[in-house]
Amino acid sequence: MMNWRRVILAAAVVAAPCVGGPAVAQELDYGAFKASVQPIFITKREGYTRCVVCHGGANNALRLERPGPDGFTEEQSKKNFETVSRLVVPGKPNESHLLLYPLVPQEGGSAYHSGGRQWPTKQDPNWQTIARWINGQK
């Protein structure tokens, strides 16, 4: 017996790219990530823990490589870029877990982040930096 839910789901997945014309995938810029985004994860801000303290080698979605005494190696930066990219919807910062989880819920952040809140508002300079990167800034 055929499972109709699976048939409907499969049809929706196949048809989705055709709805509304072709989708243009926006790429995330690796150079901009290294220069502007990755440093945010290790920067100490008063009243906040560095992201890498909880996420350095952690067993969660944002598993960051920890830098050595001379900073991040190229291999570490590439791994961090790959990890972080999975938490981003290119062109849509307000749908990207990377920005929503550490944002306070009152400002639209996710209630499911069990860690600290890094950003009290979307106007926070670091939130804005990551949002610009997600929007394609190079």
Question: For each predicted feature, which ranges?
Answer:
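Bacterial N-terminal signal peptides
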Residues: 10-18
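Aromatic- and Gly/Pro-enriched helix-to-coil junctions and flexible linker segments
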Residues: 23-138
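Bacterial N-terminal signal peptides that target proteins for export
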Residues: 1-11
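The N-terminal extracellular segments of secreted preproproteins, especially immediately downstream
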Residues: 3, 17, 50-53
